[in-house]
Structures are given as C-alpha cells and as structure tokens.
C-alpha cells in the first residue's frame, strides 16, 4: 500500500506460505473435514432437538456446542476454499474485521459452554440430589445467553482497536484468514493497547475457564475416589470421558496456537498457519464423533437414520 490509511485497506491472504502451489490439493482434505463437521454437528443438533430423552442440561449444552462449531467453521472455511481453489486472495478491511470478531467471539463462547458442561458434571457427580434443582432447562438457557453475551462483549473491542491503526507498508497477511494478532502486526502505529487488551481478554475468558474446569475435575476426582466400589468409580468417570476429550480437543490447539503467535517468531510461518487451520477444524470434526460414540441415544438414532435410508434405497432398486 503506497499510503497510510485506516478503514479502506484491502488485505491479501497468502494461505499457507511456501505451499502456494499445493493449495489446490490441500483444499480437498480441508473440504472433507468441513463436510464432516457440518454433517456431524447438524446431526447432533437435530437429534438433541427431536429426542425428548436428551432434553437434559448436558445434551442441551452439547447442542449449543454443535451450533457454535457450525458457525466457527463456516466463518472461515468458505473463504479458505475460495483462496485455495480460485486464488481469491483479497479480503476487504470490513470483512476481515467481521471475520476476526466471529472467530474470537465464537471461540470465547465455546470456552464458556465447555465450562458450563464441566459445572454440570461437577453437580451431577458431587451433588446428584441437587442436580435437577440447580441445572434445569431454564438455567441452561440462561447460561447459553450469558455465554453469547460474555464472548461478544469481551472480543467486540478487538475490531475497534484495529480500526484506530494505520496501515502503511504491507497489506499481506501470512495466513488463511483474519485473526487479531496477524492484522495487528501489519499496522504502522503503537499496537501496545491491542497487545495488552488481547492478552487480557484471553486470560479473563479462556484462562478463567481453564482454571474453573480444572477445579471442577479436581473436586470430581476427589468425590469419585471416595466411592466404595470400583464399578461405581468407573461409571462416574465414564460420564466425564466425552467432556474431557472435547476440552482437550479445544484447549490444546488453542494454547499451542497462542504460544506460537506470541513466542514463536523463529518458527516458519507454515507452522502457525497449519496450526490455525487445525484449531478451527479439529473441534468441529471430532466433537460429534466423541459424543456420538459415547451417547447411546445419539448413536442409536444415527444408525436408525442410516438403516431407513438404506431400506428406501433397496426398495427403490427392488421396484425397478
């Protein structure tokens, strides 16, 4: 960009630095993962909404999680695929800020829902007699609203902080989509407020959530170890396995990506970009698989849907 400007910049997305010639082929596994994520999460939302036996807090939170994963992956994947297959590298300043907001806000909302699910497990195991009173459907809906408001309020300032900056030198983003850290690095201005607020928001949302999730499981483990029989302990731990898997799938890539963004300047840019793409696609892909494999009602409904579909196909073939 030849001159400084504030709000009329057009950014250019590189994709995966060093692998530009392979973008066309890289797009196919990304599309496959996106299709799996869309299909799996839509199935979860449909089954939880239509299966009355799943209208319990844990599964309502799971439905919220699936909806967030759908929104998070859809906020980036269409543009990534357009970049990889049609060389659509340009993204307007406003579109970049909008994408940035949704990526960060939806991640914060998902973190809050994971905390709520940990609280649900804590109450169910440590205070089972109070579970129905503490976490009814009304409270569950209120927690969902709080999660949306919390994530939106904490990360709404990020686009505003970017808007105050001037961009004079490069408009090239070494990434497949827009995130605060990468856009901020292109600015020709003091970015200290952006750095401080971005780090503060992450610590106050994800940091606090991780702390309370860890505390919940510390209390859960302490309670479970006091159970008299091995079968009771195994059953109690079994109700937490799916949630632990989902928590690890979300936070491990997120923490790794945050560390690489802030302290991995010596690493090749390809590492940061690939980790970013994995972070956006891994949870939406594996969350439905984790909960589908562990939840009998979801597993049964999915198998029944496939059986009905196969029976109809066989009848159609037989009719011919």
Curated annotation (Swiss-Prot):
Topological relation to the membrane, as annotated: Multi-pass membrane protein
GO molecular function terms noted in the UniProt entry: G protein-coupled receptor activity; nuclear steroid receptor activity; olfactory receptor activity; signaling receptor activity
Any matching Pfam family: 7tm_4
Induction: Up-regulated in prostate cancer.
Stretches that traverse the bilayer: 25-45, 54-74, 99-119, 139-159, 196-216, 237-257, 273-293
Coiled-coil boundaries: none
Keyword Glycoprotein recorded: yes
Keywords, alphabetical: Cell membrane, Disulfide bond, Endosome, G-protein coupled receptor, Glycoprotein, Membrane, Olfaction, Receptor, Sensory transduction, Transducer, Transmembrane, Transmembrane helix
Record: glycosylation sites: 5
Described function: Olfactory receptor. Activated by the odorant, beta-ionone, a synthetic terpenoid. The activity of this receptor is probably mediated by G-proteins leading to the elevation of intracellular Ca(2+), cAMP and activation of the protein kinases PKA and MAPK3/MAPK1. Stimulation of OR51E2 by beta-ionone affects melanocyte proliferation, differentiation, and melanogenesis. Activation of OR51E2 by beta-ionone increases proliferation and migration of primary retinal pigment epithelial (RPE) cells. Activated also by the short-chain fatty acids (SCFA) acetate and propionate.
Protein name, as recorded: Olfactory receptor 51E2
């Amino acid at each position: 960009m030849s001159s400084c400007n504030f709000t009329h910049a057009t950014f250019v997305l590189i994709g995966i630095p060093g692998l530009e010639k392979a973008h066309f082929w890289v797009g196919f596994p990304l599309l496959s993962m996106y299709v799996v994520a869309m299909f799996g999460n839509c199935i979860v939302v449909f089954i939880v909404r239509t299966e009355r036996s799943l209208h319990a807090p844990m599964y309502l939170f799971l439905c919220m999680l699936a909806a967030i994963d759908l929104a998070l992956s859809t906020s980036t994947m269409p543009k990534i695929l357009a970049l990889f297959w049609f060389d659509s590298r340009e993204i307007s300043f406003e579109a970049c800020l909008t994408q940035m907001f949704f990526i960060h806000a939806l991640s914060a909302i998902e973190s809050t829902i994971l905390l709520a699910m940990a609280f649900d497990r804590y109450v169910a195991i440590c205070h089972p007699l109070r579970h129905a009173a503490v976490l009814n459907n009304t409270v569950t809906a209120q927690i969902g609203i709080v999660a949306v408001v919390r994530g939106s309020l904490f990360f709404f300032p990020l686009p505003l902080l970017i808007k105050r900056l001037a961009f004079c030198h490069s408009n090239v983003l070494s990434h497949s989509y827009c995130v605060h850290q990468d856009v901020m690095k292109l600015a020709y201005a003091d970015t200290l407020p952006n750095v401080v607020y971005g780090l503060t928001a992450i610590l106050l949302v994800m940091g606090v959530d991780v702390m309370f999730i860890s505390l919940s499981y510390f209390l859960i483990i302490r309670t479970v170890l006091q159970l008299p029989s091995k079968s009771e302990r195994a059953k109690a731990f079994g109700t937490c396995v799916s949630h632990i898997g989902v928590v690890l799938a979300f936070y491990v890539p997120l923490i790794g990506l945050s560390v690489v963004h802030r302290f991995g300047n010596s690493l090749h840019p390809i590492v940061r970009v690939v980790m970013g793409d994995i972070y956006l696609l891994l949870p939406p892909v594996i969350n439905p698989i984790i909960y589908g494999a562990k939840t009998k009602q979801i597993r049964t409904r999915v198998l029944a849907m496939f059986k009905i579909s196969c029976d109809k196909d066989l009848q159609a073939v037989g009719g011919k």
